[in-house]
């Protein structure tokens, strides 16, 4: 039996879940998302990815600045939803909102809780060198990602994965998982399990100040740092090009052998020495320029030893 749902989400990560719920026959009474924000060269107001999709589908869209007022609660209740589905909404739900739907509010989280509670689980999993991560559906409570878990799916994390790659994989995996969870909820067969009190870690929001590459770390750590911050905010370093100090973001790389001083360019293929081993740059981006493959970059900006990356 299909459910009547409120969907609450904002970025691209949430769109596949919205589409899967509709494909499985659930009725979306309303979509809650964050307000339009300036973006692009002209800094024009742009609706969120979820808002764009909801408008295309003819679903009512709401962008409240707060959910803490009696009026916001009354409006939320007026939709007559059985449950709410929350995917990267970007606003904390007060207890009154959590209590409003008869069947509860259910969140899709991009980690294997209780590891990486918080804002940046995908980035932190890669940066920490986790061998696997996943997605979980939990019934929300007042804590930070502390609700009872309904379902989970795991995925291996490889050295080749960037945060963007893992984001896209988890978005699709999570959409299928939430559809299965809502089907079980509709049947009355959704089983909930308390989160473990052991292994709790927190995925702090990414700070741009931590994006600078430290070449004095082992090569594998540098790779994880680069991939965990790719494409945003982008791990960066500086190099000298035509007498000018240029900032470059490295978006994708691989670990290779190569002894040298940390930050030293080892060859003409963008191999850079680290404390232990080296990385070979595969994709990068100069400030104000689009991302490009290393080969294309080197065609326009040949680099040869001796030089150093700061």
From Swiss-Prot:
HAMAP family xref list: Formyl_trans
This protein's UniProt keywords: Protein biosynthesis, Transferase
Natural source organism: Nitrobacter hamburgensis (strain DSM 10229 / NCIMB 13809 / X14)
Function comment: Attaches a formyl group to the free amino group of methionyl-tRNA(fMet). The formyl group appears to play a dual role in the initiator identity of N-formylmethionyl-tRNA by promoting its recognition by IF2 and preventing the misappropriation of this tRNA by the elongation apparatus.
Enzyme Commission number(s): 2.1.2.9
NCBIfam families reported for this sequence: fmt
Entries under InterPro entries matching the protein: Fmt, Formyl_trans_C, Formyl_trans_C_sf, Formyl_transf_N, Formyl_transf_N_sf, Formyl_transferase-like_C_sf, GART_AS, Met-tRNA-FMT_C
GO molecular function list: methionyl-tRNA formyltransferase activity
Gene Ontology CC terms: cytosol
Name of protein: Methionyl-tRNA formyltransferase
Highest taxon of the lineage: Bacteria
């Amino acid at each position: 039996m299909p459910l009547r749902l409120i969907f609450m989400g904002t970025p691209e990560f949430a769109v596949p879940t919205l589409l899967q719920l509709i494909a499985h026959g659930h009725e979306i009474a309303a979509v809650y998302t964050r307000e339009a924000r300036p973006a692009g060269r002209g800094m024009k107001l742009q609706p969120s990815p979820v808002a764009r999709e909801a408008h295309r589908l003819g679903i009512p869209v709401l962008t409240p600045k707060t959910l803490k007022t009696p009026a916001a609660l009354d409006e939320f209740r007026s939709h007559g939803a059985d449950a709410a589905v929350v995917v990267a909404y970007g606003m904390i739900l007060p207890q009154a909102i959590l209590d409003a739907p008869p069947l509860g509010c259910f969140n899709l989280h991009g980690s294997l809780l209780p590891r990486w509670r918080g804002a940046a689980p995908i980035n932190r999993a890669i940066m920490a060198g986790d061998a696997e991560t996943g997605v979980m559906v939990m019934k929300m409570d007042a804590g930070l990602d502390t609700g009872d878990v309904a379902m989970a799916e795991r995925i291996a994390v490889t050295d080749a994965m960037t945060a963007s790659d893992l984001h896209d994989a988890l978005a699709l995996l999570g959409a299928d998982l939430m559809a299965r969870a809502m089907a079980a909820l509709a049947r009355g067969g959704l089983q909930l399990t308390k989160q473990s009190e052991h292994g709790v870690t927190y995925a702090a929001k990414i700070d741009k100040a931590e994006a600078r590459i430290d070449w004095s770390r082992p090569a594998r750590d540098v790779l994880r740092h680069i991939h965990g911050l790719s494409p945003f905010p982008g791990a960066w370093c500086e190099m000298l090009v035509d007498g000018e100090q240029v900032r470059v973001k490295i978006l994708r790389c691989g670990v290779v052998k190569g002894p040298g001083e940390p930050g030293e360019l080892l060859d003409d293929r963008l191999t850079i020495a680290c404390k232990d081993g080296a990385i070979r740059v595969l994709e990068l981006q100069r400030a104000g320029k689009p991302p490009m493959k290393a080969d294309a970059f080197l065609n326009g900006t040949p680099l040869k030893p001796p030089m150093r990356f700061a």
